[in-house]
Amino acid sequence: MDMGFHENEQNQEFANLMEIGSGHYGCSHYRRRCKIRAPCCDEIFDCRHCHNEAKDSLHIEQHHRHELPRHEVSKVICSLCETEQDVQQNCSNCGVCMGKYFCSKCKFFDDDLSKKQYHCDECGICRTGGEENFFHCKRCRCCYSKIMEDKHQCVEGAMHHNCPVCFEYLFDSTRDITVLRCGHTMHLECTKDMGLHNRYTCPVCSKSICDMSNLWKKLDEEVAAYPMPKMYENKMVWILCNDCGSNTNVRFHLIAHKCSSCGSYNTRQTQRGSDSHSCSSGMPQVVGSTG
């Protein structure tokens, strides 16, 4: 009975330490009960993102800009008792849990378990969304949803570059990322912003980022409804299709040029036709970017 009582008491004490201050400390990036000492500049910050916003922004002189090396963090400060100590999940002084999720490899703390954090050894960092829902693509060198397994277009180091819209580095971004049909990646929010501005092609390779068949049908109707003047009706131009990569020779039209191979209007003119009267004959045209 006594042993059971003491065991229950210990369990209750552990539960209390897990909850004391939970959700009340941290920053705009993470809820956590500790701060970190940056190994690069020896200053104290709530998290690595807070450090990078302060030390790697445009208002800092370029030769002073730097990012925090997350794996080199060795000291943390408990937010409740302010004790500085080696990296560990529970405070060495007051015993409070400094993060319900703790990764000793990334020196990472987070009290919000709803993110379903997990550490990927192949990525070398912690990710969110639940390990059971993701797989690591060795060629793309990042974690993707299992829905995409054996279904995505591989691109070497797909997320090891900046977003082509906002230029934030994608690999360790905390914002949602989408994989386009061509295999290139960008922030989901940036993709939606492109849609608001009627931009439906990949900023990297110019391929269509969604099913454009309905728009192509409308363009078929538009082209049929507006025949070219007699001086242009026999004019032929060479076009390159951004979607399938084919070079085809098609009839010139002011509205759009349709790929003879795949039927896409996401094309651009690559060579002057036989008739030089048109001022637009040498201009590139990407109809897929209009909506």
From Swiss-Prot:
It catalyses: S-ubiquitinyl-[E2 ubiquitin-conjugating enzyme]-L-cysteine + [acceptor protein]-L-lysine = [E2 ubiquitin-conjugating enzyme]-L-cysteine + N(6)-ubiquitinyl-[acceptor protein]-L-lysine. Phosphorylated at Ser-173, Thr-178 and Ser-208 by SRK2E/SNRK2.6 in response to abscisic acid (ABA). Phosphorylation activates its E3 ubiquitin-protein ligase activity. Expressed in roots, leaves, and anthers and stigma of open flowers. A zinc finger (RING-type) spans 163-206. The modification Phosphoserine is found at residues 173, 208. Zn(2+) 1 binds at residues 27, 29, 47, 50. It is found in: Nucleus; Cytoplasm; Endoplasmic reticulum. A zinc finger (CTCHY-type) spans 98-162. The modification Phosphothreonine is found at residue 178. Its EC number is 2.3.2.27. One of its GO terms (cellular component) is nucleus. A zinc finger (CHY-type) spans 20-96. Pathway: Protein modification; protein ubiquitination. Zn(2+) 3 binds at residues 78, 81, 91, 94. Induction: Induced during sucrose starvation. Repressed by sucrose. Induced by cold, drought and salt stresses, and abscisic acid (ABA). Zn(2+) 2 binds at residues 40-41, 51, 66. The keyword Metal-binding applies. Possesses E3 ubiquitin-protein ligase activity in vitro. Mediates mainly 'Lys-48'-linked polyubiquitination. Promotes abscisic acid (ABA)-induced stomatal closure, reactive oxygen species (ROS) production and drought tolerance. Involved in the regulation of stomatal aperture. This is E3 ubiquitin-protein ligase RZFP34.
